[in-house]
Amino acid sequence: MMSLRLFSILLATVVSGAWGWGYYGCNEELVGPLYARSLGASSYYGLFTTARFARLHGISGWSPRIGDPNPWLQIDLMKKHRIRAVATQGAFNSWDWVTRYMLLYGDRVDSWTPFYQKGHNATFFGNVNDSAVVRHDLHYHFTARYIRIVPLAWNPRGKIGLRLGIYGCPYTSSILYFDGDDAISYRFQRGASQSLWDVFAFSFKTEEKDGLLLHTEGSQGDYVTLELQGAHLLLHMSLGSSPIQPRPGHTTVSLGGVLNDLSWHYVRVDRYGRDANFTLDGYAHHFVLNGDFERLNLENEIFIGGLVGAARKNLAYRHNFRGCIENVIYNRINIAEMAVMRHSRITFEGNVAFRCLDPVPHPINFGGPHNFVQVPGFPRRGRLAVSFRFRTWDLTGLLLFSHLGDGLGHVELMLSEGQVNVSIAQTGRKKLQFAAGYRLNDGFWHEVNFVAQENHAVISIDDVEGAEVRVSYPLLIRTGTSYFFGGCPKPASRWGCHSNQTAFHGCMELLKVDGQLVNLTLVEFRKLGYFAEVLFDTCGITDRCSPNMCEHDGRCYQSWDDFICYCELTGYKGVTCHEPLYKESCEAYRLSGKYSGNYTIDPDGSGPLKPFVVYCDIRENRAWTVVRHDRLWTTRVTGSSMDRPFLGAIQYWNASWEEVSALANASQHCEQWIEFSCYNSRLLNTAGGYPYSFWIGRNEEQHFYWGGSQPGIQRCACGLDQSCVDPALHCNCDADQPQWRTDKGLLTFVDHLPVTQVVVGDTNRSNSEAQFFLRPLRCYGDRNSWNTISFHTGAALRFPPIRANHSLDVSFYFRTSAPSGVFLENMGGPFCRWRRPYVRVELNTSRDVVFAFDIGNGDENLTVHSDDFEFNDDEWHLVRAEINVKQARLRVDHRPWVLRPMPLQTYIWLVYDQPLYVGSAELKRRPFVGCLRAMRLNGVTLNLEGRANASEGTFPNCTGHCTHPRFPCFHGGRCVERYSYYTCDCDLTAFDGPYCNHDIGGFFETGTWMRYNLQSALRSAAREFSHMLSRPVPGYEPGYVPGYDTPGYVPGYHGPGYRLPEYPRPGRPVPGYRGPVYNVTGEEVSFSFSTNSAPAVLLYVSSFVRDYMAVLIKEDGTLQLRYQLGTSPYVYQLTTRPVTDGQPHSVNITRVYRNLFIQVDYFPLTEQKFSLLVDSQLDSPKALYLGRVMETGVIDPEIQRYNTPGFSGCLSGVRFNNVAPLKTHFRTPRPMTAELAEAMRVQGELSESNCGAMPRLVSEVPPELDPWYLPPDFPYYHDDGWIAILLGFLVAFLLLGLVGMLVLFYLQNHRYKGSYHTNEPKATHDSHPGGKAPLPPSGPAQAPAPTPAPTQLPTPAPAPAPAPASGPGPRDQNLPQILEESRSE
């Protein structure tokens, strides 16, 4: 529905845009067709650099003369146009181009308005060479006849050079001028109007701070009002009100500031239903109207500029507007054009003119660091009189300085702390100082009149009666020759202006010196006085706090070129009040070492929700966050029905529903106790299924389950355990009895909490009453901090694009061993053809984390470099990056912040149109391999785990530990990944400990026994009946242990890394308890024992039929297994040697159908097979007995024979399929549940013991995890000093001997070898093709060297023998003969 409304608003904008507002297709180049006389400039450099050559793509370009202090290029479009873009080039084939410039526009050549980009920046970026065209599409279209370009910076290797292009289209203007006593009204053609969508649009300019611009109303409370209040534009709108509607319809929205600047401002209001857009000068504010109506019902008139006739009594306190209004559009009707044409439906009040008659005061804009204007005065007069008007945001600045004549001193007027301070210094006398005014830096015009003459001085501000300040003091006044406004030139010794005050930044006008008005036109053209760093005929003041860039209701204070945010009492800090001051939860306070008490928390961090106060119940292992409300006491309800129910709203202390919902959403667990008591009042039992009473939770969702029940079912707690008063109903209150009944319990589903309302609807009968009671919301844990994902194969996650407006903060943890990768990236639409906005955080190298972005000023990046370690060390590292209009910063772990201040007037609009990539750059470039967790953008946690997809290479959690664990989980323990470590889940085993290797056992005194019920008789009969109707497929019966039929499966063995399958189970189960066991086709039994007595029954499993299983000790001390599956028992002798030696023994028995696997102690595994006549199923198991069989009914005589006097010894690690009775008995918290207490019974003394069994692989348990580890305590004597010295000498002697043997071997091998001369030619490799042996030489052969005697040492493989030398060739005959003596060995 919301998207439909927004679409309709856009549609209405498009439809109405053609009626005087949008001008779609308005993209004509306007400079090219102009005559040369329409192009002017302040000066020109040469004949071919005049303004006429400043057209885009021209053969030259405009360049001012060298030394022009205020150069500008001016375009006269001959009539008013709508301007949408500006483009620049440098001068053709030169080094001359402009790098920064200011754009001024206006309807007259003596009144200019600076065009401000987003962020109130009046500076445009220009060119970087002489040929490329740089185009700026303006964020809103303005109308003007004259365009002026003021260069601010240019190529330092050249000079100013400019070619210009302006894009737009002709504009038809219909202007109405109001003098404060005028107004017009437009009457609808068909009387009253009723509309679902509306468009109001117009332009205005004024010098007044207050005035009514537009008003219309209806008889049912509908109205639309646009007015100026304090130079702010206010929109009041209502779609009507009614006594039966609870919500009022009035809505007020404010935009802009200092709108009384005699500049055109463009206003537009679009509405569709209750959704509306309010636009001022290109800044659009979307809001939703209050109330419940969607149509605007108006009477027959719209008033412009004020009220006419009887309508004045409705808005008697409003001032009429004084100024110009242009092109008033209402739903495609141009009311201003109809007024100019004197249409019959237009009513005039007063003399409304059809052209602007606003005054032109010729202001001066002071915006430079050393700006000033110097004008001459009339010297040696006895009366000094100065007056002027100024407006500014700055607290300080020099307004006026003048030297008195005859060396008598000087006079200073300065702005200090928002008031005008006067200082008169005279030679030989004490300085006179006094002040006047208050908060004069409010951005409005203020008039100053100062007069000083002999013995007294007077200053008045704004001609307020009684506000002038008169001072009597012995003064001698002689006026000087010069007056400096706005600052002092440098150097001061040359100009004679000596002041320590900073330059004034703001605007001045109507300068008067000694009673004469200064002609500023002469000053501008250097015919009077002097100036520097100022602009004439314009005032560049703007409201930098509108819109307010300070977040979370921070207060904005501005100066001429910047603003400051004050964040006191907001709960936030930082340059824009974006960073949260408080922690997210009580768990964070616990981890920081706090104690129980009241604390302020901020669950959404830097998000829009406000912080609030809660009570933190901080304990050793967790911290409960407690949020109280106004329903902590019982609420009585009578007289309610389903048609008119009682709505019990829950108002939480210090917090709204959204803020409490954010707390619950970020918590690991939440609970809230709800109790409903009734007297002759029903709760859920209705004929139509819709309940009488229910509760409302998060997001205003209705829930029909009550405390102690589960979501999705319409029941109370008693309906789950079938303990309701009426077994046929699901709640106690549904019995509808004339006595008090109660349904109560905990609500624990986090996504439904908190409870926001309780609705009661069945108390309107006689003697009917209901009461409900709700306890505080209690939460613990943080499920956002460990929202983790791992990237394995260069995958990426795609999220919706970032829409952060003016500030963005990103925080996350990463862990990797890869040297580089992109954590996240979001790209936007192109600024131009070759640039796109983006934001990216990446691991650039193993030692560098980079935050890179482009917000329109080019590529920027911040880098955190690590010298002491690498970031890819497979440890968790915290990254925090933030960007706003004031600065960008980056931090890794606890290293210092890396800061990058933003240029002044920077505008940031972090709204992107492409998906947000997490784990890589766009299109999966530069992927990250590793783990990410707790990724938050502006306080919102990204659900990384929810986007995990194993097929794409992303997995929930930071996996990898359980693949190759350092210490495996034994006895079927389940390995659980814990991001930076792992744990072993021992719930499905009979063991505990860190790796499921600690035995849990009990010592049985004589006569002690234990019974564990596997299922009740009623359940067994029902199960057996269903089993007979539909026999399940083998291997899929309940109780079947997965994995038995898997190839390579070894029954009874759970080696390192064994992992049982995960079973869905709500909450944490009772240790060792897994509910009833039905007909099974296999058993897995394991236990350990030690005893000195025989005979005894160690373990016995009975059934509701004659089937059983037993492990017993015979009289001779041997171990025997007995099975009865069907008719006859099966007996197997487990051991041939006695086991009654008091030592621990282990037994592992596994049966799969008719295959039996047995292992006792460390003997080899044996396999037995049952006869085909034996049944393969243990039917209807009933109970498990340990120590002794106390079963009723028929028992095998052999079992009775060994059953007396009972087992005496120790049993541990007992497990029958998925039941561990001893672990359940010793590890279940007391008191037990009724179901568990009924299932288990112990007779006699049973005390916990591990039966002397050592934990498995004790040596592999790391010492830091073993609580029983003690360091070695053996005495150590340092008596091995001489032994170490002797050993050192012995090793050195052996090494020397080995080296000597190698030297002797070398000498012996080379004894007869040396260098000698021969006349034999060298062999040529290409003279014997095919590898044939060469012929013997014709001359005498050289005697071969004697072969050395063989040694015992192994020799390396011999090198290939060289070919015999041939006779001297022609190349070797002329070589010089080198004779060498043989070296002596």
Swiss-Prot record:
Q: Give the signal sequence positions.
A: 1-20
Its domain of life reads: Eukaryota
Region spans: Disordered: 1317-1385
Report the SUPFAM superfamilies cross-referenced here: Concanavalin A-like lectins/glucanases, EGF/Laminin, Fibrinogen C-terminal domain-like, Galactose-binding domain-like
The EGF-like domain sits at: 545-577, 962-996
GO BP annotations of the record are: axonogenesis; cell adhesion; central nervous system myelination; cytoskeleton organization; mitochondrion organization; myelination; myelination in peripheral nervous system; neuromuscular junction development, skeletal muscle fiber
Q: Write out the GO MF terms.
A: SH3 domain binding
Under the heading CDD domains, the entry gives: EGF_CA, FA58C, LamG
Offer a single GO CC term for the protein.
paranode region of axon
Membrane-spanning regions, if any? 1285-1305
Per the UniProt entry, the glycosylated residues are 121, 129, 277, 421, 500, 519, 598, 654, 665, 764, 805, 844, 861, 949, 957, 1079, 1148
Q: Its biological function?
A: Required, with CNTNAP2, for radial and longitudinal organization of myelinated axons. Plays a role in the formation of functional distinct domains critical for saltatory conduction of nerve impulses in myelinated nerve fibers. Demarcates the paranodal region of the axo-glial junction. In association with contactin involved in the signaling between axons and myelinating glial cells.
Q: Which PANTHER family match?
A: CONTACTIN-ASSOCIATED PROTEIN 1, PIKACHURIN-LIKE PROTEIN
Stated name of the protein: Contactin-associated protein 1
